[in-house]
Amino acid sequence: MKLATLPALILLTLAMVIFNACSTANTSLAGEWKLVSYGDADAPTLALPGVDTSISFDEGQFGGTVGCNTFGGDYTLNSDQMSIGSVISTLMFCDQTSAQESAVLAILSDKTMIITQSGNLLTLSSGDGNSVVILEKK
């Protein structure tokens, strides 16, 4: 009888480890990320030097700054896909950062993003794969 419970116990432990690994994959977004590059997936544009452009993720909510404006919204994760709700932002005009701000917010406004994380880099790709926002963990 005891030999029959050992495989069941091992299977249960393995299932718990796998379940835990899956649930912690989503928490790797938590924290603050700074913009590295954005735009065309084949040739992303480098972020403007000296301009604080960052995004933070926390329990289904995100927010950040894209130069002189701030933005935020909500999201849900399903494996490597992020579904984004409405993105809201302030609307101040800043001549030197407006092109970067507009491009980053347009990409983030795509309702479905594909997430790829490699070390300290996080890539958010538009649903069609044509546009990216590449972030580095702060």
Language-model features, listed with the residues they occupy:
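N-terminal secretory signal peptides that target proteins for export/translocation
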Residues: M1-L3
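Lipid interaction determinants
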Residues: L6-P7, L11, M16, N20-K138
